[in-house]
């Protein structure tokens, strides 16, 4: 009987040992899986934090760069009116000494406004001779032209402006079209 017990014990021992190893490995495998999952979650959280930080930095830079957009848009009418005032003075009055100082004052004011625009990243859109760009130009009329290629800006009714890389106001333009024969 003792031999039978020994035989049974020997047979049982190999069967119980893999089971014990499996039980020991199972918690380690489970812990390694959880550890890997937590590592991935930490990496994801770090990446998300970095993305949020970048987005906030960009929003902050945009806010400071474009903070004056509304005010700048309002000032464009001042620039337009100064230009109209200068254009309305006939050549014969420009030679008159009595008008000369007024003209000089208007020119200096227009130049100073242009300098302020430049310092704040506001630039005039060069429209004449350019191809119509719907992102910068607003076509108001098509004009027949034998000299210009169709789709080319041949008339500027109102100047357009950019503030840094954004459109502040589109240029109102006339575009060439093929003349009717």
UniProtKB/Swiss-Prot annotation:
It holds the Pfam family GrpE. Its main location: cytoplasm. CDD domains: GrpE (cd00446). Keywords: Chaperone, Cytoplasm, Stress response. GO terms for molecular function: adenyl-nucleotide exchange factor activity; protein homodimerization activity; protein-folding chaperone binding; unfolded protein binding. Belongs to the GrpE family. Homodimer. PANTHER family: GRPE PROTEIN (PTHR21237), GRPE PROTEIN HOMOLOG, MITOCHONDRIAL (PTHR21237:SF23). Participates actively in the response to hyperosmotic and heat shock by preventing the aggregation of stress-denatured proteins, in association with DnaK and GrpE. It is the nucleotide exchange factor for DnaK and may function as a thermosensor. Unfolded proteins bind initially to DnaJ; upon interaction with the DnaJ-bound protein, DnaK hydrolyzes its bound ATP, resulting in the formation of a stable complex. GrpE releases ADP from DnaK; ATP binding to DnaK triggers the release of the substrate protein, thus completing the reaction cycle. This is Protein GrpE.
